[in-house]
Amino acid sequence: MREIIYWILCAFLTVAIAIVSLRYVTNFWLLSFLYSFQLHLGVLFVAASLVILAVRRQIYGFVLLFVSLLLIAHGVIMLGEFSEGGRGTDRPPLFRLMSFNIAIDNWKNSTAITDMVIASNADVVNLLEAKPLAFHLQQLFKAYPYHIGCDTGKDTCDTLVLSKRPFLNQQVVSMGSLRKNRLVISSVDFGGETVNLVSAHLSKPYFDDFQMAELEDLAKTLGSIDGPVVLSGDFNSSSIAPSIQAFLRKQGLKTIVPEPATWPIAAGSLGIAIDHIFARAPLHLTSLKHLDDNLGSNHSGLIAEFVLDRDGETSPAK
């Protein structure tokens, strides 16, 4: 009987490992979101392997355990590829940026979110699904005199970018064909240095191949921008998803690893990071934290600080 149970468990675990390992063969959109959980699934597979070995110690159980450990190890390696490595942590930040998907139906917390944004001391704020803030815009605009988005009523209030400094240029465009106006490109002068700010809100990866098309458009946009770049927003995928990895690698984007988990809220720090803040040299992140309170959103917000490193020198904001 133990032999039968052993091989049944081995069969189920083999299939599960094979599905997760498909990422090394093909980036099938239906499994894209699953790939974001490779580390979590690897831990689950290790636990399952130990259960199998407790039932019967045979060589195939050890093979499954070894492969499960490889999935975890490679997940850690993949995250490390895009790490800033703690650069410039002893320097004063050039500016501070917040990025937060507040959830489009989060009306009851709109006042608290408004107060939190104003009290954050962020120089730039990137708010996604900002419709619930439609009745607090004037209060926000007093604290942040410059903004992009939410100009024509609450029904078109989706991405809202706020700044304490004037925008040198600004543009709102679409990515892919599923949703409109979810890519905002702007630039702001900090201490005599022009920093390019890009806000993106990608579709869920299991919505056919829409996210892939959006990433292609986003890559074209970033490829046309010279100089320091910050990319922030809701990617609906972790940094180890194959499509996101290829995008980050091609664009030379970095972040602080491990990234704070932003979803699902109930999982806390055991969740995954699907909301991101990336930087491209000569701009570097020195701090990346999640907000203390999600304020009713199904995402945790992020706040980051940056330094600009030209030949080892940092330009302070003025």
Residue ranges and their predicted role:
Residues M1-R2:
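Short, Lys/Arg-rich, polar N-terminal cytosolic tail immediately upstream
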Residues I5-I52:
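Membrane-embedded alpha-helical segments of integral membrane proteins
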Residues I5-Y6, G88, L133, R249:
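Short, flexible segments with low predicted structural confidence
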Residues L31-S32, Q58-L65:
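Short, aromatic-rich membrane-interface segments at the entry and exit
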Residues L97, A103-I118, V124-K318:
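Soluble catalytic domains of enzymes that build or remodel membrane lipids, polysaccharides, and related
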